[in-house]
Structures are given as C-alpha cells and as structure tokens.
Amino acid sequence: MPVSMAVCETANVVNAALRESLGGNSSAAGSSIDQAKSGEDSNGSLQNHIVANAKRILMAKIEYEEVPNYHESVLENLKSKYIVIKPGNPGAINGFGGKNNTGKVVGANGHDNNGARKQAEHPNNQSHHNNHNNHPHPTSNPNELPKPKRVLYPRENIRIGWKQSERKWQVGTGMINVGNTCYLNSTLQALLHIPALANWLVSEQAHLENCNVAESGGGCIVCAMAKTLLATQSNQSAVRPFLIYSKLKQICKHMVVGRQEDAHEFLRFLVEAMERAYLMRFRNYKELDQLVKETTPLGQIFGGYLRSEVRCLSCNHVSITFQHFQDLLLDIRKADSLEDAFEGHFSRERLEDMGYKCEGCKKKVSATKQFSLERAPITLCIQLKRFSMIGNKLTKQISLKPRIDLSKYAARSPAAQAQPLTYRLVSMVTHLGVSQHCGHYTAIGSTDTGSYYNFDDSYVRPIAMQSVCNTNAYIMFYELDLSQAASPAANRPNGVRLTNGHSTTPVPAATVSSPSPTRFIGPQLPPGGVNGYSNGNAQKTAIQFKQHHQQSQQNGFQLGTGKFQDTAKPPLVGAHAKGDANPVPTANGNKSSSTSSNSSSNHKSINQQQYLPISSEDEDSEDEMTPRPTTAQLPSMPKMTDDHTEKPKSPVKIQVKTPVKTPLKSLVPYESASEEEEAPQPNPRKRRSEEDSSESDQESGQTNGHSKTNGSLTNGSASSSVHVNNSKQKTDAIDEIFKSLKKSADSDDDDDEEESSIQLTNGWHPQKQSQSQSKAPPSPKTPPSPAVIKSKTGIWKVTRNDEVDDIDDDDDEEDEAPAKIQTPSKTHRNPFSSTKPSTESPATPGAKRQKLLNGSAVKSHQQPRVGNGYQSEATSNGSTINELLKQSHRGYGSSVLSWNGKPAELEKEPFELVCAKRIAGHGSVDGSDIVESSVAVNASSGSDSNDVVVIALLVDAREQRQRDLDDDEENEMDRGRQRKVKSSGSAKANNASNSTPGYNPFQEYEGQKRWNKNGGGGGGFPRFYNQNFRQNFQQRNKFKFNRFGGPGSAKFQQQRALQRHLAAGGGFSRRQPSAQQQQQQS
C-alpha cells in the first residue's frame, strides 16, 4: 500500500554520537602535561565518530506510514500520463447525448442543437483548469474526444440555413473569367452558396469596418471574401473577383496567375488562408495549441473528427485515436454511387499482415482498422478521387442524392443513433474534360428558395434537380439539416411562403420514423396551433390535405414543387402521402406533382416572389418519391390521345389479296430478319411525314405502339421479291467472279428452287401483284431481303415470282446476243493458257454491275459474302480484284489464314477456279494476247460452247497445277550440298529458270531483233531463217520440254504451233491492240 515516509530526527542522532564520543574520551585524561595532546586526539576522534555514526544512521531501516492526501496529490498526476484500462468509476465515461466534463449538453451529432450552452455542476472544474494548464483534458476519458482549453468561436454561433439570417438572399451573379480562372470562380461560387459560411461572412461587418490589415486596399482575406459575397448579391451583372485574384500569391505561393490550377487544391489553401487571417486577430495566436486553433469559425463550419479504431486480432486490444478533418476524400474506383463510396470509406479494412505493433501484445500483429464519425461537421465537404495512379481522370458517373443520411457511420450509442444525421446538398464544383490537366470548372449552388443554379463563369442559369444528381461532380458541399432532429418546439430554419408574398408561421417538419406508416414530403400547415403539432395529428392533416387537394384540382390549381399558380383561391399547402403519389389529371388538364425539385416546374419567373422556399425536409426522400404515370408506357410507344384511350382494342387484320394504293408506307421493314437484310426505305423522314399526314384516317389500336395501315400491304418495297439462299453464303470471292463471268445454263433449275422457297412461315401464300406495284427503289448498299411481318397470326414473309421471270428473260437475251471473241493474253504463271470466249458486249459489264449493285438479279442469292458476311460490290471488271488475281496465290511463304481465322479456301480444289479465271479473260501482265487453243477457237456460243470451255479450262487448270508442283521441285534452292558449276549452258539454264516462270516469245522476238540488227551471218534475210537463232532457241528452252508433259500434251502442241508460226514469218514487228490481233488471227 502506498504510504509516505517518516524518518527520525537527525538532531537526536547527532547528539547521541557526540555523547558517545565524549564519554569515551573523558576517562583517558590523566595529567596536565598531556592535556594538549589529549585535546587534539579527542577532536579527531570526535570527527571520526560522527562520520561513522552518520553512515550507520543513513543505512538504518526506514519506517513508513500512510497519509490521507496521497490520492489527490499523486494519482491525479499519474492519470494524465497513463491510460486507465479499467476505470474504477464506470459513470466517468461520458457518451454522446449526456453531460460531458465541460458541462455542455450535446446532441446526437456532437454539438448543441438547441443553440444554448449550459454549464453543469462540477466541483473541481475550476481547480483543474488552474492547476493543470499543460493538460487540456485532465479529467476526460482517453476514449473520448479531448476538449480544448479555449474556444475561439463557439459552435453554437454558427447559423445553419438561409433563414437564420435576416438578410434577403439573392441568387447571385456570375464571375468574369480573367484568364484560366474558372477554378477560382467555381470554388468561390460553391463557397458563397453555403448558408453557414455566408451567414458568418455577413456577420463580420464590425471587422470589415475596423480591419487593420491594409493589403492593396482590400484588407485581409476574410474581408475580401465578405466583400465579394456582397458584390455578387448587390450587382445585377457579372462581377470580377479581383480582391481574391490579387491575393493569389498570399493564398498559395506556388500558384501562378493565368495558369490552370486544381479547384480542390485552391479550396484547401483558401480555407487555410482564412483561418490564418482569423487567428491573427489574437495576440498570442502562435502560442495556441492545435485543439484551440481548430475552434475558428472555418474549423467549426467545415471541421469534424474521425474516430479510428485499430483492433488487434491476437489480443483484441483496441487502440482509439481521433483525427481532425475538413473534407472527406472518397475513392470511386469500385463505387457507382455516393452511398457506395461512403460504405467503402467507413468499412472495416485489414491492415498489412504482421505490420501493426500492438500496445497490448508489444509485438507486430495483424489488425483491422475502421473509421467512424466522432463529431460530424456542420458543412460536409466531399471530394471524389477522380484521378488514377497513372495520371488519368476517372470520368465514371457517380449517382448523387440531394439528401444523405450518415447516422450509421456515427460513433455513438444505439440510443443516440436513432436520431438522424441528415445532410442536404447546397453546392458543388464540377469538372468538364477527359483529362486532369485540362478542362473547365463550373459550380452549382442552391438558393433560399430551394432551387439550384448553374454558375459557368459569368453565365448563370437554373438547373433541374435531375440534372444536378446526374452531374459529373468533383467537390460537393452538404450542410447539416437540423430539422430532422429538432425538438417539436424548435423553430423551423426555412419558412413557407406563398405566391402572393405572405408567409405563414414557420413550423417544424413532422419527424416520422421508419415504423411510422405515414410519410410527409413538402411544407405542411398545422391543423391547430401555430407553434407546432405532434406526430399524433399527422394522419388527420393528411386526410384534410387530401380533401383540399381534390377540391383544388377542380378549381384549376396546379400544385408544383417550387411554385403555386393561384387561379381562384389560395391553395392549401401540403404534402402527398406515399399512397397518393400518382398525379391525377385536373379538370383543366393540369397535373399535380409531388416531387420536391423546384427546377422541375415548367414556368420560370424573374420575380422571386413566385418561388416557394423549400425547407430542409421538403426535399426529403426526393429520390424515393417520384410521380409515376397511371399507365406504364414504353419509349417506343406513341402518345395516345383522349380519343384513343376510350376506344376498345381490336385485333389487327392483315389483308394481302387486294393491294390499295395509298400514300402510307407499310411498316414491314422494321421487323426484318437481320440488319443487313432489311428492305430499303426511300426516305425515312418523308415516309414518317406521310404517315403523320394520314394518321387521322387510320386506326391505332395496337398494343405494341406501332401505327398500322388499313391492313393491306400497299408498298411495293415491303413485298419485293428477293430470294435468299443461305447455302451460298460461304462461297469464295473468286468463285463469285468466275460464276458471274460464265453464263449459267441451269437457270431453270434455279427458278424451280426459288419457287419452292416462296412460301410463308405459317403457310400463308400471297397473291401475285402487278409489276408496277412491286417495283422497289434500288438500294446501293444493302441487298434486299424478303419482308418479315409479325402479327397475331404468326411470322410470315412476302415474295413474288414475276420479277424472277423477267430477269431470267433478260439473262437469256444476253446469252443469245452475239459477242466478239476476246483472246486473253498470257498470265504471270501460265504463258500458254487457253481461254474461253467472252459473251459479253462492251455495254454488258456496266449493265451487269448495275444489276449486281441493285440486287435485282436472279443470281443474287448465289453471290457469296466476302469477309464477315458483307457482300462485295465489285464485279469481274473491278481493278482491285483483277490486280489481286494477277498475283500468285502461293506467295513466298506459308499459307495465309482468312479473315475469320480459318484456312484459306484458295487451296486444293479452289485453285482450279483461280486458274480458270486467269485463263478466262484477264490476259497477261503486259496486256498482249496469245493464240488460244483449238478447243477454245472451235467452241461455239451458247450453253454447249460454255460447257466445253468450262471443261477445257478445268483440265488445263489441273495440268497447270501439276506443272507448277514439278517446277517447284526442280527450282529448289541450293543449300550448299552441291557445288555450283559456272558454264555457258548452265548460266543460260539458270537464267531461264531463275527468271519468271514460263517463256515469253514476244520478249524473245524483241531481244533477237536487237542482237542480229548489225551482226553478220543473217544478211538481209529475216532472222527467223537464221539457224543459229533456232539453235539458240532450242538450246535455251530444251529444259522446259519435259515440264510440258511430253510431245503429246496440249501445252506442248500449243508451243510447237507458236514456234512454227514464228518460224514461218508470222511474227509481229510491233505490239498490236487486242482487236487487231483478233482480226489478224481470224
């Protein structure tokens, strides 16, 4: 047990030592001679004895005894240095809702809602402040928020809401942008539209008159803000915030005039500059501690305290700390709404494993951390983290609400949490742009009428509540709404004013908890007294309002959210119950609305007497209570008039037998099978206007909302005959060109096949229509498709057959038309390729291309789809396809995959079609032609000749492919195993083999002409009779004889015929056009 020490008196111990020393020395004195010696010895002996006795006394046992004042003198000092884990008096812990140590009665949100500071009885309160000035919280619980020893500006002096001031608040003017100052203008507009801050600035009138800070004639930064606020309230045009702009360096040193800055950064520096300016009013402001500096007006308005609880997962020890904040930075990477961002911010998170040193375990352990609101601020500033780690801006949409409830995030007792902690949106700063380094800032602010305005530099315009909630916000300011937690006798912060300017007595909102069945929205009048009413009269008020509401509708009133239009009597101001949220049409056509957005009204007036001030609870549950129409309508449904609503719905009748010519267009294409197969529409706007013009003559009784005609299919485009063959959609592009060049001999089979496909899904067969009615305008891009109609009888298609017969007849005429035989020249791979005669006239390619583009050809269903299902618009004469076909499909590398990732179809069998296409009509690279084979020359025009030509082409293609394979084996590159021998013969052979494959006789002719022009041996005879030329020709080309399959092959015969022709003098001295060659060969 702690006691105080009681030690015996030192004088008694010294006296005992002297007596003991003197008593021993007195017996030793014997004679007078020895008196002097004995005196000296006695003095030394006395000193030695005193020292020895003092040491013995200091080492003696100490006796203790308890004193009654130990608890007050010692333990109180120890309490200020250590944390009491288990206090002896449980009642010493003071929670919210009760009396704290300073004697102030606080509410559920941490401050006095009644606005009166009350002192509680504390016997030692004055002694604590006098004796322990070094400890501002001598008797407070360590788990509670410490109390400052001095309050610079009481929290109760903050006036919340526009109605707390006697001043009449205007909307405010805009601010002129003086050069990249949109961040400054928007921040100032957001701050000046906070009621608590505006009321404080107006109350600083005495300081404005006596401010001793002379900086450019504008005073301190607080005076500059107050003067700017008064300027925006008094002027009618945009103002220039030069008082703030001139102090930019004083606000923040690194900010440069004319440069873009961050609005939130400027906001933080501006608030700190205002706090410094306020602290300078006190003499010893530098000696004040941090808790006292946080009691400035700016700290009381924006400041709050977060409670951080770190719990050890090993010993469950909880470490509680408090943190002062003036804004909340919310992470929105995983949030889609503001509520989600709050949940993520105040959720429990786990710290790094074994990274927290626990005070109880005295070692590093795993722990969890959670934030909560110890004391909520009056004005909550929220910044959304719209920046990523890589420097980009997060432009995602975050849904907002005009009211938020933070009761579940408050660190209070369950009884105190029952009282709501509600905030209402007062202003915000938005950023427009895709990057955080550039863009434009705007602001949104609320007024005393409850409406919101958008401030874009010097432009000010009203904005609807829905637009405010859907804005890409960056900084938001929410002000505490005390009306939800106010007592019944307390006055309401915002009054109710009618359109004629007369205001009623302010009354508080009915506080309805969640179990209460009745929910009131908007301003209400009490049924009885003026000072207020209890919750028991709420149901009666709702009934009375419902009756008056019906009467007001008959009288022609329009009850809006922010305005009242008085036509006969003053309407009764009230609120809708939750069950009566649906608007009811009035007698004069107007509708009453139960929403709380002022900007949702359709009428705006300059005179502010026409606005109804919305109180703080008028906007409650704004997102929950929205007017819903009686009948749900889809966006695609047309607006039904009164006449249509009374008509009974009748089943839709579809008539196909008798087409009637009307200006109405049929609505068939909107239900086409696919986007690519929709029937073309000539002009959607024109068609729509025609439908509107004749809408009065038609019935509109459908359930899907689409307007119908009288039931007949009148538009030819809706019933145009287009035959779709799905089995032809994967044909190769080159196969398409090859089939378009040759004339089809089996058109009758195609017609039979098409006729079999002309039937409807559910068995309906349409009647044939005339040619004039069924002609549809051609579509230059989209291929036509059979129309699909959805009705109650099922899904069916409409096609016709007359156009097919007409197109077949046209094709037969083209087949029978005589055409000149065109001899295509050699190709890059095959110099002696046989070709087929072209049966097209010079005008045929253009007509054929036009038919293909219009989509009206018979074989349109046979046209393949190139790529990802899109149809190629090019025909056989297209330059791009011709250029691609001239190139080798084999290339110099491995096979190339197609666009859809599958192996190309130009391998194996399709190669025959490629060779056939080359032989058919593309000629050689240099544009010259060769003599075609006898099979092609003797072939006659018509279907028989086409079959013969096709068979010959396929045979030649297979042989050419085999020769190419053999040529590849012969021309393999030397890999070093075989030594190259340089000789004249091998050099010629190598030159021939390394050159372009195939022999070019015309190049040989030109070369021999240059060699033998002045040389001897030839004389004046033609060089064709020179035997050296023939020997050289044979010597150079003998290695190709085996390649052509021997003397019996067709290609060998072609080569020999050409050689004989050249040897007989049939060569050409100059290249001639293709037409002259054909005439000469014929």
Swiss-Prot record:
One of its GO terms (biological process) is germ-line stem cell population maintenance. Its EC number is 3.4.19.12. Residues 173-481 form the USP domain. GO terms for molecular function: cysteine-type deubiquitinase activity. Residues 503-518, 588-607, 766-776, 983-995, 1053-1063 have a biased composition (Low complexity). Keywords: Hydrolase, Nucleus, Phosphoprotein, Protease, Thiol protease, Ubl conjugation pathway. Residues 532-542, 701-728, 822-842, 857-882 have a biased composition (Polar residues). InterPro entries: Papain-like_cys_pep_sf, Peptidase_C19, Peptidase_C19_UCH, USP_CS, USP_dom. The modification Phosphothreonine is found at residues 658, 662, 782, 823, 844. It catalyses: Thiol-dependent hydrolysis of ester, thioester, amide, peptide and isopeptide bonds formed by the C-terminal Gly of ubiquitin (a 76-residue protein attached to proteins as an intracellular targeting signal). It comes from the Eukaryota. One of its GO terms (cellular component) is cytosol. CDD domains: Peptidase_C19E (cd02661). Residues 777-786 have a biased composition (Pro residues). SUPFAM superfamilies: Cysteine proteinases. It is found in: Nucleus, Nucleolus. Residues 24-45, 104-149, 488-886, 960-1026, 1040-1082 are annotated as: Disordered. Residues 640-649, 729-746 have a biased composition (Basic and acidic residues). Residues 747-756, 803-816 have a biased composition (Acidic residues). The active site is at residues 182, 440. Required for maintaining multiple types of adult stem cells, including male and female germline, epithelial follicle cell and intestinal stem cells. May function as a transcriptional repressor by continually deubiquiting histone H2B at the promoters of genes critical for cellular differentiation, thereby preventing histone H3 'Lys-4' trimethylation (H3K4). Controls selective autophagy activation by ubiquitinated proteins. Interacts with atms/PAF1, but not with CycT. Belongs to the peptidase C19 family. This is Ubiquitin carboxyl-terminal hydrolase 36. The lineage of its organism: Eukaryota, Metazoa, Ecdysozoa, Arthropoda, Hexapoda.
